[in-house]
């Protein structure tokens, strides 16, 4: 299996509850390694740009508002099958449907405040990583 990188974000609902360490530990315990990490407070413009793929969806305004409401922690994770592994550890988008022991089952407040975001494919991982990090910020 090839080592790959993925993008991960700890959302404002989780950072406001001081869950950054607990969530990062869950990711690391699953075999993922943090090779870049920074805490950012998204502007509305940054949130609109990052979530541009959803701009025509009815929840877009609420999503932008939420994502710019407090700090987030953006990370690059590395490991074997990092994209699939990160998504497995995060759990289903709706915490009610998430498997026991996943980040969203343990920490999410609702489908909207679901604590984490992760890339869903190699292409989106590359785009999302590039949105927040320059190459020199990623230290393997």
From Swiss-Prot:
One of its GO terms (molecular function) is nucleoside diphosphate kinase activity. The active site is at 117 (pros-phosphohistidine intermediate). The keyword Ribosomal protein does not apply. SUPFAM superfamilies: Nucleoside diphosphate kinase, NDK (SSF54919). It comes from the Bacteria. ATP binds at residues 11, 59, 87, 93, 104, 114. Its cofactor is Mg(2+). Pfam families: NDK. GO terms for biological process: CTP biosynthetic process; GTP biosynthetic process; UTP biosynthetic process. It is an enzyme of class 2 (transferase). Its main location: cytoplasm. Major role in the synthesis of nucleoside triphosphates other than ATP. The ATP gamma phosphate is transferred to the NDP beta phosphate via a ping-pong mechanism, using a phosphorylated active-site intermediate. Homotetramer. HAMAP family: NDP_kinase. This is Nucleoside diphosphate kinase. The gene is ndk.
């Amino acid at each position: 299996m090839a080592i790959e990188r993925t993008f991960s974000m700890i959302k404002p609902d989780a950072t406001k509850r001081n869950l950054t360490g607990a969530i990062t530990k869950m990711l690391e315990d699953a075999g993922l390694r943090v090779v870049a990490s920074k805490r950012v407070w998204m502007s509305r413009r940054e949130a609109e740009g990052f979530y541009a793929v959803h701009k025509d969806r009815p929840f877009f305004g609420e999503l932008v508002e939420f994502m710019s409401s407090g700090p987030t922690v953006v990370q690059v994770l590395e490991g074997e099958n990092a994209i699939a592994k990160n998504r497995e550890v995060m759990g289903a988008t709706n915490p009610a449907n998430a498997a026991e022991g996943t980040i969203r089952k343990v920490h999410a407040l609702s489908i909207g405040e679901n604590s984490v975001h992760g890339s869903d494919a190699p292409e989106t991982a590359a785009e999302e990583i590039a949105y927040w990090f320059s190459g020199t910020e990623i230290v393997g």
